[in-house]
Amino acid sequence: PETQKSKLDSSRLFQQIFLCCSITGTLLLGFALGITLHFSISTFQTQLDDMLKTTALSLADSAMVREAYHQGYCTDEMIHYFDTLVDTADNMDVLTLSDCNLIRLYHVNHALIGEEFVGGDQGDALAGKSYFSDAIGTLGLQHRFLTPVRGTDGSILGFITVSATMTCIN
């Protein structure tokens, strides 16, 4: 009877230790996965923001883009260049060039060229600031970077918006 009781106590102790270790391991694994997911999302967001910002600032400083604003339209070659840029860039879904009257000189949906910019978040860009914004455009909810396009004299000609749709981000 004593040995049976000690075996039973040993068995219970083993079960308790096993259960405790299993719970601790599961909690540690969940914590590690949570930390990894957080850093992965953070890294993705940083890379996305860098790409949107770099693209917009590079285009805004381009002589080709300034030429489009001075002409009041994009040539077929410019449209092809912008189309290719959007098609080949990871996570960039929308590129828009708009003048100070909010008229689009370029949009990925060519039917929207000549139409008014949508989103209502362009005010600071027209005031000379560059910034990120989340707004609803013609292609839905977007994470955007907006920046002014300046003439060689420093005057604001319009603005560029480079966006990733939230469906792309999610």
Please place each PLM-identified region on the residue numbering.
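Extracytoplasmic/periplasmic sensor domains and loops in membrane signaling proteins
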Residues: 107-140
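Short beta-strand edge/capping elements of PAS-family sensory modules
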Residues: 157-158
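Extracytoplasmic/periplasmic helical hairpin
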Residues: 62-116
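Extreme N-terminal signal-anchor transmembrane helix of membrane signaling/transducer proteins, especially
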Residues: 7-38
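A short, hydrophobic, proline-anchored segment that marks a local hinge/packing element in signaling
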Residues: 144-154
